[in-house]
């Protein structure tokens, strides 16, 4: 089993463990008996998109199935901002995975078109980024902002997109 990357626990309230089908049985066997039994009863086997969230003292612990290693895509993380309980999540994942791509996928999943909504708030489900270096954090933020700008422009009605409006967005 590949060596996992563990984010510092102090920065996050919750823990998300992402694993492949090939590793699921070994990871489940190493859990506390109650957790292992629950995951087994729920049929968790690391299938792509499968997610189990359990409350525990001081936060939650979640397991995300990434599917087979050969079919993995970082976009597996995209739906999580709308599926997980609010708070900051520390991610434990295979060290071979691209942290930049995972954080971009998470950021894309947190997108919401709020231009015409009053009182809208950003996603309250955050992925802890303390394990990323400053250059990676900057690159992730820039890429997510670019995607979100394009999505905002696509979602904006054409009658609100005169030349001055488009210039203001850019």
Residue ranges and their predicted role:
Residues 1-169:
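Short amphipathic alpha-helical segment within the helicase RecA-like ATPase core
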